[in-house]
Amino acid sequence: MAAKISFQRINSDYPNSAIKAPSYLLMVQKDSLSTFFEKNKMANNVTSFYTSCNSTNEYTFSNISSLIRKMSEARKFGMAADPDWTVKHPNWNKVLLVPIQLKTQTSSSTATISGMEHSVGIASTKLVGGSENPYAPINVEIVYGKFNQ
């Protein structure tokens, strides 16, 4: 299974504004946000992902299937042990999008990402979504295969 989600940016009404959109966004499980930065973690493409704004004005997170699978497994095992598990763990299926800055190290003219920090600079963007969304809904694209027997 492969899954992808894109978040369309809504352009500012003030194009000459000094406030720019975040260069990078981190997708991380809501319950893991504080420990992600406290423990200096990096996006691992399993439970956390990062992306930049692309040429079509979107932040696209590709192949998030491992995250979906981990969340589903946590719910499955949690519910097997405790029927009230989802009530006790209301964020089991929640992620946050957080602006980040990448720390890099350069060696022999090759830059390598050495860390991720919560972006504390002035940046802002508005993404399509929410209950009052006048735009097309956010779609999660899922591709999977199944063998016929």
Explain the meaning of each model-derived region.
Residues 1-149:
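Secreted, disulfide-rich extracellular signaling modules
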